[in-house]
């Protein structure tokens, strides 16, 4: 049908929207490659004991750099050793905060993406969000010329606020402007742009490009470029016709927007679909967070939804994304940053592969397959690190295990939770459930970002045995508690949840979605 095609305006609009997703991915990955350079700068600015030459070796001090190095003139060897240890702990803490502050911002903002989109409209909300992206980029871009640790932590926090908003706004906008039969395919471009941003940040972070003493601050501030480009292009994008029709009740503007997006005057199907959606939505009330846990019809679905997101984050995947360079270094790889880029490339490739598999294999099946694969990869990852001193070839075992770990993650546990949470709930409770799921996802992201380095320091090469145990627990939970949602109506899914929880059917049925497929998770 004419309306179910990708027009020039639709392609332009989707490209513009996913520039926000690209920034999201760039901000996730950018902190990884220049880790050693930034840590050296932290030590240089904060002051390090003179016998710890690792912090200042080959560091080119220019007129703007004022070293605050403490001299050991009147200290005993024991006191000096304590001071050195204390300095190392402070630097480790500041680096962990530099990584995890991004998740704090995302955690705070994740609840407000939908609210901002309803308040300002989808286009204006994305424009407003970009002010946060530009502010964060400016703070980080200037970090070399001030208190670097404070500016980077502040900049990462503000960028996290932006990403928390955009993680809700972009999928929502794309889902609302896409034709029904293309909604799933276009919706996955959010995730694809995100992992592309991660890969580009890793390439730009190579030492001979921007990940060096001279340009690392430019690398951190470079997200301003797609932010400015998106601000410019958004001025030429049509507002969401669903927002105009369902929220503002402006049918004339909604029709005008639809005609631009569809490239045709015949928009009857879309208007009728929105009219039906409006009638159905009016019969079903919204649900609060408390009701999700107190109402027996929602309690088990929300618990399962949250557990899926916990499984995604506590699998250890973000430990790899945030700290992959140091992990490869520990594994004995001579050029760890190139291996990290390999992880980013595999991440992008298998995100695309998952799109082709999800409707054929089913959500639960792919999630289980991914978790089982990640369990074995985590075991071999740790075995490779533990036995590295005895067998140098074990470094290749660890590296291969990391690549496969990321592949299995993107096949199932990466994208699947977002599909399934949307399918567990009908129109009334769905916005609240998705907001709560996003919040829990960011909270777990923050915990891993903050704690992984400490856990890795404590457990050493055994760290991924811990994550293997966690993955095994979530795999068993998925096997016994998570239903398959592919091809099932909401009534069928709700009935299965009621059977598992032993609750009675609801006294009064509400209007539900007739069929739940991947193209309908908006």
Curated annotation (Swiss-Prot):
Spell out the reaction equation it catalyses: D-glucose(out) = D-glucose(in); D-fructose(out) = D-fructose(in); L-dehydroascorbate(out) = L-dehydroascorbate(in); D-galactose(in) = D-galactose(out)
Q: Where in the cell is it found?
A: Cell membrane
> Which positions make up the signal peptide?
none
GO terms (BP aspect): carbohydrate utilization; cellular response to fatty acid; D-glucose import; D-glucose transmembrane transport; dehydroascorbic acid transport; fructose transmembrane transport; galactose transmembrane transport; positive regulation of insulin secretion involved in cellular response to glucose stimulus
- Source domain of life is Eukaryota
Which CDD domains does the entry mention? MFS_GLUT_Class1
Q: Which family does it belong to?
A: Belongs to the major facilitator superfamily. Sugar transporter (TC 2.A.1.1) family. Glucose transporter subfamily.
Q: Where are the transmembrane segments?
A: 11-31, 97-117, 126-146, 157-177, 186-206, 216-236, 302-322, 338-358, 366-386, 402-422, 432-452, 460-480
Specify the protein's topology with respect to the membrane: Multi-pass membrane protein
Q: Which residues are glycosylated?
A: 62
Protein's name in the database: Solute carrier family 2, facilitated glucose transporter member 2
The tissues in which it is expressed are: Present in liver, intestine, kidney and beta-pancreatic islet cells.
Q: Which PANTHER family match?
A: SOLUTE CARRIER FAMILY 2 (PTHR23503), SOLUTE CARRIER FAMILY 2, FACILITATED GLUCOSE TRANSPORTER MEMBER 2 (PTHR23503:SF27)
Activity control, as annotated, is:
D-glucose and maltose competitively inhibit fructose transport. D-glucose, D-fructose and maltose inhibit deoxyglucose transport.
Task: Give the source lineage, highest ranks first.
Answer: Eukaryota, Metazoa, Chordata, Craniata, Vertebrata
Q: Does the record bear Phosphoprotein in its keywords?
A: yes
- Binding residue positions for D-glucose: 191, 312-313, 318, 347, 410, 418
Q: Which UniProt keywords apply?
A: Cell membrane, Glycoprotein, Membrane, Phosphoprotein, Sugar transport, Transmembrane, Transmembrane helix, Transport
* Reported function: Facilitative hexose transporter that mediates the transport of glucose, fructose and galactose. Likely mediates the bidirectional transfer of glucose across the plasma membrane of hepatocytes and is responsible for uptake of glucose by the beta cells; may comprise part of the glucose-sensing mechanism of the beta cell. May also participate with the Na(+)/glucose cotransporter in the transcellular transport of glucose in the small intestine and kidney. Also able to mediate the transport of dehydroascorbate.
Q: Which residues carry this modification: Phosphothreonine?
A: 521
Which residue ranges are assigned to the Extracellular compartment in the record's topology?
32-96, 147-156, 207-215, 323-337, 387-401, 453-459
A single GO CC term for this protein reads: basolateral plasma membrane
- Molecular-function annotations in GO: D-glucose transmembrane transporter activity; dehydroascorbic acid transmembrane transporter activity; fructose transmembrane transporter activity; galactose transmembrane transporter activity; insulin receptor binding
Does the UniProt entry include the keyword Phosphoprotein? yes
Q: Pfam families annotated for this entry? A: Sugar_tr
């Amino acid at each position: 049908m004419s309306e179910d095609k990708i027009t020039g305006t639709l392609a332009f609009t989707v490209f513009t929207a996913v520039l926000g997703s690209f920034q999201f991915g760039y901000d996730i990955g950018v902190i990884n490659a220049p880790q050693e350079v930034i840590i050296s700068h932290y030590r240089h600015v904060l002051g390090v004991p003179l016998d710890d030459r690792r912090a200042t070796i080959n560091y080119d001090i220019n007129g703007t750099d004022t070293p605050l190095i403490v001299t050991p003139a009147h200290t005993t060897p024991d006191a000096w050793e304590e001071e050195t240890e204390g300095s190392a702990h402070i630097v480790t803490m500041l680096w962990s905060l530099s990584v995890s502050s991004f998740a704090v911002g995302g955690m705070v903002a994740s609840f407000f993406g939908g609210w901002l989109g309803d308040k300002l409209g989808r286009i204006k909300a994305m424009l407003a969000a970009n002010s946060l992206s530009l502010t964060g980029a400016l703070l980080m871009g200037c970090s070399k010329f001030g208190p670097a640790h404070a500016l980077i932590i502040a900049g990462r926090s503000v960028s996290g606020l932006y990403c928390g908003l955009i993680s809700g706004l972009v999928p929502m906008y794309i889902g609302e402007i896409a034709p029904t039969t293309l909604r799933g395919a276009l919706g996955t471009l959010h995730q694809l742009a995100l992992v592309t941003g991660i890969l580009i940040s890793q390439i730009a972070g190579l030492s001979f490009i921007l990940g060096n003493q001279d340009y690392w601050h430019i690398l951190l501030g470079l997200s301003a470029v797609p932010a400015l480009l998106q601000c410019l292009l958004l001025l030429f994008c049509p507002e969401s016709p669903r927002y105009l029709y369902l929220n503002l009740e402006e049918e004339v503007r909604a029709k005008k927007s639809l005609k631009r997006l569809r490239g045709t005057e015949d928009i009857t199907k879309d208007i009728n679909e929105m009219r039906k959606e409006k009638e159905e939505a009016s019969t079903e009330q919204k649900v609060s967070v408390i009701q999700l846990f107190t109402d027996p019809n929602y309690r088990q679905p929300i618990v399962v939804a949250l557990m899926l997101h916990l499984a995604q984050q506590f699998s250890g995947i973000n430990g790899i994304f945030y700290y992959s360079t140091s992990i490869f270094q520990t594994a004995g790889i001579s050029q760890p940053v190139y291996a990290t880029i390999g992880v980013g490339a595999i991440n992008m490739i298998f995100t695309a592969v998952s799109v082709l598999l999800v409707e054929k294999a089913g959500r639960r099946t792919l999630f289980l397959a991914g978790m089982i694969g990640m369990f074995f990869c985590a075991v071999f990852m740790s075995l490779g690190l533990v036995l590295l001193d005895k067998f140098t070839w074990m470094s290749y075992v660890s590296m291969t295990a990391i690549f496969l770990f990321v592949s299995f993650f993107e096949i199932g546990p990466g994208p699947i939770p977002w599909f399934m949470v949307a399918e567990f709930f009908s129109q009334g409770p769905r916005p609240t459930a998705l907001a709560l799921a996003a919040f829990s996802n960011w909270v777990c992201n923050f915990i891993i970002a903050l704690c992984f380095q400490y856990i890795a320091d404590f457990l050493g090469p055994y760290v991924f045995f811990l994550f293997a145990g966690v993955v095994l627990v979530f795999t068993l939970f998925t096997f016994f508690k998570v239903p398959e949602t592919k091809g099932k109506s909401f009534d069928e899914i709700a009935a299965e949840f009621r059977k598992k929880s032993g609750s009675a059917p609801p006294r009064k049925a509400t209007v539900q979605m007739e069929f739940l497929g991947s193209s309908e998770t908006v």
